[in-house]
């Protein structure tokens, strides 16, 4: 399946280089008991600076001079004059979120109950304080097909109703709708310079309804929400300069109730880039991510990223790339729905900490 914000056969320009304040924050001693060591790569994890909104089609960005020149709006969940770090991509859609007015809603979750709910894969998150009562609220941007909401506890909701996007069962050669968030990393860490890469994330799929009926074809139709890191050779003196690799951490995929325990590698025509997919069971455990529970991933994924590079070398790629040439430059996460599905998920606690080697 096509990854990140790209549609098949379309090469989109690079990400906005805008990771400013909030990135590069090292762990303090006070945080040492609960927070993994290292420098946080995810900037503005609470989305306090909002999101720059993409146009509806990648070629607009490609031909218009980049994301910063072609973004159609900024979604502000709280008042801020700072430029957004996050980008929200709404590719191949009929409905533009630009101009949507924010509204505050009660999301129905009880603060006391929500604190501590998670799946089998990890410990409870901290959605509410102990003893806190009442319902949580969220700021919502929505239109006929999309719903993006940020709760007061930092939980992000991404909802996509593709029954309003597609007027027929999607065919194999047709683009599909995306709704995802992405950012570049400030001071991207090089693989050779870190001894650990601590990944954490909590995920809950609220619903995913297949509207295709008998027209459903699992070869071309699904609703999925992958997480991707970009690994790229940034050494201008290297023959592999500019060569990139998508390293995928699969999450929910409608087609598979049980997570796979094998890696996959394939060539993506649209971005002329290999995609290496980490065995998702190594990240989430042997769980059903679509069961309506919170699930948590928390582990050092550096060995898995190193394995991704090794797998590429086994295929004859990155042969002129030393570990010090390869940097982890950015991420994206969200819905890719190449079929008629109505789906919504929530995400919280996203963190990626690079623990540098101490000389």
Locate the predicted segments by residue.
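C-terminal motif of bacterial Sec signal peptides marking the signal peptidase cleavage site
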Residues: 20-22
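Bacterial lipoprotein signal-peptidase II cleavage site
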Residues: 24-30
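Extracellular carbohydrate-recognition regions
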Residues: 33-110, 131-143, 359
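Long, compositionally biased interface segments
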Residues: 280-359
């Amino acid at each position: 399946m096509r990854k990140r914000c790209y549609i098949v056969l379309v090469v989109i320009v690079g990400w906005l280089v805008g990771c400013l304040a909030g990135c590069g924050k090292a762990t303090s001693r006070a945080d040492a008991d609960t927070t993994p060591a290292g420098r946080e790569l995810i900037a503005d994890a609470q989305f306090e600076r909002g999101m720059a909104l993409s146009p509806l089609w990648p070629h607009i960005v490609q031909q218009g001079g980049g994301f910063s020149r072609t973004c159609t709006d900024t979604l502000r969940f709280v008042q801020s004059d700072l430029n957004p770090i996050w980008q929200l991509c709404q590719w191949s859609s009929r409905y533009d979120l630009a101009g949507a007015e924010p509204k505050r809603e009660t999301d129905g979750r009880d603060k006391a109950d929500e604190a501590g709910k998670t799946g089998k894969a990890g410990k409870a998150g901290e959605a509410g304080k102990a003893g806190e009562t009442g319902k949580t609220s969220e700021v919502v941007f929505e239109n006929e097909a999309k719903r993006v909401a940020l709760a007061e506890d930092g939980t992000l909701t991404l909802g996509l109703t593709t029954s309003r996007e597609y007027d027929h069962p999607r065919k194999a050669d047709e683009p599909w709708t995306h709704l995802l968030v992405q950012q570049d990393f400030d001071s991207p860490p090089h693989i050779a310079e870190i001894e650990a890469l601590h990944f954490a994330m909590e995920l809950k799929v609220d619903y995913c309804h297949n509207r295709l009926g008998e027209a459903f074809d699992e070869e071309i139709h699904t609703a999925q929400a992958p997480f991707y890191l970009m690994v790229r050779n940034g050494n201008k003196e290297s023959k592999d300069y500019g060569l990139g690799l998508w390293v995928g951490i699969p999450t929910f995929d409608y087609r598979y109730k049980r997570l796979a325990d094998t890696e996959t590698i394939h060539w993506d025509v649209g971005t002329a880039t290999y995609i290496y997919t980490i065995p998702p069971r190594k990240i989430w455990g042997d769980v059903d991510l679509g069961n309506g529970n919170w699930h948590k991933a928390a582990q050092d994924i550096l060995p898995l990223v190193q394995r991704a590079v090794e797998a590429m070398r086994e295929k004859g790629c990155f042969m002129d790339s030393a570990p010090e040439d390869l940097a982890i430059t950015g991420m994206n996460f969200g819905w890719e729905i190449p079929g008629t599905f109505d789906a919504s998920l929530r995400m919280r606690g996203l963190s990626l900490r690079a623990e540098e080697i101490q000389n």
